[in-house]
């Protein structure tokens, strides 16, 4: 069997960034499609055949696989990606197991979606550098836009935000 993923996704100096998005629900597919627009090589992985089919032909490569399975992730060269986004929201155990596997791989640029504060705390304890709370963060953003004259509001970190005022 020929391993095409190695030639497609192995990071190369001066080449476009390689990103694996593990979990292709609403959040993961949004991230993956935006990364494609940003000229990244994107490998999308999900266990749901419907999610994979929906993105077929829209990402550099999209595969049906279990992101908690070490051998499957190695065959897809996920351990060689520049960035990995764990976008699994529906199954807390799968999210944690996938993050744990990525940490064992030594993934340096690891992003993970948290469903709630407890999930986020577990992800931070596992060493995730970038924990994303999409619902909470968007709720805060909308609240600031509704209650002020800001045209846009992006919280960079607690106590620090970028705003565009009218």
Task: Annotate the PLM regions.
Residues 1-166:
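Cytosolic regulatory regions of ion transport systems
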